[in-house]
Design a protein with these regions (language model features):
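Hydrophobic packing positions in regular secondary-structure scaffolds
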Residues: 1-75
Length: 75
């Protein structure tokens, strides 16, 4: 299911994806947004981040940073 979701978001215009993510985060679903972002192409995430609200982009950036730090510790 999630691979299908990421495929949909990878094909979506970045502004539309960002609008949906902003809405989802506003509804308290930031973990769901983060899970989707982890499965997207990096170039698409970059474009989507440009359109997210500043607070949401900041939170997701911190989550990505923490995820990468934890991933490096495991490797």
């Amino acid at each position: 299911v999630e691979s299908k979701t990421s495929k949909i978001y990878n094909q979506m215009k970045p502004k539309i994806a960002a609008d949906i993510f902003n809405q989802m985060i506003g509804e308290g679903k930031i973990d769901d947004v983060f899970d989707i972002i982890l499965k997207l192409k990096e170039s698409n995430v970059t474009q989507i981040m440009k359109f997210l609200s500043v607070p949401n982009a900041s939170i997701l950036t911190q989550m990505l940073e923490n995820f990468n730090i934890n991933k490096e510790k495991k490797d």
